[in-house]
Amino acid sequence: MRRLRRLAHLVLFCPFSKGLQGRLPGLRVKYVFLVWLGVFVGSWLVYVRYSSYAELCRGHVCQAVICDQYRKGIISGSLCQDLCNLHKVEWRTCLSSVPGQQVYSGLWQGKEVTIKCGIEEGLDPKARSDLAPRQELVLFDKPTRGTSIKEFREMTLSFLKANLGDLPSLPALVGQVLLMADFNKDSRVSLAEAKSVWALLQRNEFLLLLSLQEEHASRLLGSCGDLYVTEGVPHGSWHGAALPPLLRPLLPPALHTALQQWLGPAWPWRAKIAIGLLEFVEELFHGAYGTFYMCETTLANVGYTAKYDFKMADLQQVAPEAAVRRFLQGRHCEHSADCTYGRDCRAPCDKLMRQCKGDLIQPNLAKVCELLRDYLLPGAPIELREELGRQLRTCTTLSGLASQVEAHHALVLSHLKTLLWKEISNTKYS
């Protein structure tokens, strides 16, 4: 016991000489107080972190709900057997950022995958995986029994029109949905298969995975009900994402830039990733299934493969133009800030009518170029930096209604891509 006391005394008071301790007796008390205050604050942060994790990470609840519905024959999917009966889907790290959308890294069929599943608001976050889900929850309620395949086709077409707009390409997308719905490849769509694919369509990211090219988004690998798996999480371009969520807002911009330069890819690789991001913006503007808006433009959403090809890390905040217009049109407002969809899709406010307009103020390209200024200018070759900075400044000033800047938008985007390709072409980085 005496040794323990001696050790504690050394730890707490050894930084101060005996002479100083004698001259400043109050310093001991202050030092002890600061040590215990540090212990208290540290314990509180650990508690908050654990509480936040318990709220955000509820994969066991997700799996319990899905497997309960599968065993009852309500849903189907290519993943169900491995997930619920054979237990061949391994859940690894929790990557969720909101409680309602569960995201995990995992392993399936020897591949690294990302597992995604929605949790209804009514589910108890403390529910255990061995407990049956609440019976009063209405899940997978459409289509109803007796719905013909023709009716389901029309139902799907109406849904896609409402979310993507009335486009001539939609019948082809409906055919793609019905082909996907036939999970067991028996050339017919059962009620369980129809319920499952309908539930998947309600997930914004799944709809985007169908609508956008696989080149810039993770490939869909399998599903069960409205749970689905995609290719593994791409490498992140924002190294502050590795920090705990509570500490991320505290990261100073200067430190953020320094982290990007020290830990990020070499500049030519960053240029290649940026070209992919610009091509993705081009696809959003001229896609086969209408126009899409990026409504949370951050480096946290910019990912890349092992070969430094751009991959969108998160499609949750990419929204179809029709959905954004429907949300904003006629919405009551006092200021433009009241006319915001997601984080940064903002429309003008008609102050006379006190209603939001449907067109966005800032196009995708202007928001992406703001990102690229911080991403590309640090470390850029000296002979390129001035011209690159000028073009990025021009790009960030793109304004006016998003639907009215198409020609200028295309010209600025083309100039930027050409400038970057010219720098890295005929090198190993291309």
Describe the function of each predicted region.
Residues 2-63, 92-93, 306, 313, ...:
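Helical subdomain adjoining the active site within ATP-dependent kinase catalytic cores
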Residues 99-101, 110, 204, 215, ...:
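Eukaryote-biased feature marking scaffold/signaling PDZ-domain proteins and nuclear chromatin regulators
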